[in-house]
Design a protein with these regions (language model features):
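Beta-sheet repeat architectures centered on beta-propellers
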Residues: 1-249
């Protein structure tokens, strides 16, 4: 999971979150981020390029248990695994989840939905038929929040003045779902769930294709400390290479 040129430091906080320090020495760049999960991180260990964690979480049984987990780039959710099934019914989940666990499921470029494990299985046939494999786990919401967007004009800086963010342009790579919110956390979030399709029909459905390129979002409202909050509502692929923000006053 960490076969990368950057340097990392992982610190377990008292509240069960992980503070992650990220550094690229050659470019003189560094920063912090916070990792959260549906449960509490207990301890963490790196073995060469692999990262393991002990997490205290409820698997649906109503009892908090300790699980040894590994971070992997190809898993779209926490406490996630690949499960086989037939006709979009995925059974034998009790090896991972207890009955009554509320989980999310994805298949390829599709978000199948939120399900409650019952009888050791979930049934996604009403969403998409004919599936034999799916990722099932607990989703998390990646969130990127900018500092207050400021600008300097001929009369001086706009700090403290009511400002609007009418437009945000994201430079996306292989992205299937993203949402943009601003100028404050109470503003309406603008979701982009990719609907591009290929000409290939699988199981009666046109397959979606990820978007690479620049996508524009229009926002409403004013704030004295306008920010842009980027997140997503569905556990699908998301990569942001850059952001352009337009400020009006």
């Amino acid at each position: 999971a960490l076969n990368r040129s950057e340097s990392y430091a992982f610190l377990i906080n008292n509240d069960g979150t992980i503070a992650v320090f990220y550094s690229i020495r050659g470019d003189q760049k560094a920063g912090w981020t916070l990792w959260d999960t549906q449960g509490l991180w207990h301890s963490i260990c790196a073995v060469h390029e692999r990262l393991f964690v002990v997490c205290a979480r409820d698997d649906g049984s109503g009892t908090t248990k300790l699980f040894l987990e590994e971070f992997q780039d190809d898993m779209p959710m926490d406490f996630c695994d690949t499960f086989s099934g037939s006709a979009s019914v995925f059974g034998s989940l009790t090896s991972h989840f207890s009955n009554n666990a509320v989980v999310k499921a994805t298949n390829g470029n599709d978000f199948l939905g939120t399900f409650t494990v019952s009888g050791g299985e979930i049934d996604a046939s009403a969403v998409k038929s004919g599936l034999s494999q799916a990722f099932i786990g607990y989703s998390f919401s990646p969130t990127l929040k900018t500092l207050p967007i400021d600008a300097t004009i001929q009369g001086g800086p706009l700090t403290g003045e009511p400002r609007q963010i009418p437009k945000v342009v994201l430079d996306l790579h292989s992205t299937l779902a993203v949402s943009v919110q601003g100028p404050s956390t109470t503003s309406t979030s603008r979701d982009l769930v990719i609907r591009n399709t290929t000409d290939t029909v699988t199981g009666g459905f046109m397959e979606r294709s990820a978007v690479t390129g620049k996508e524009e979002f229009r926002l409403l409202g004013y704030s004295r400390d306008p920010r842009v909050i980027v997140s997503q509502s569905f556990p699908l692929d998301l990569q942001i290479n850059g952001m352009i923000v337009e400020v009006a006053f």
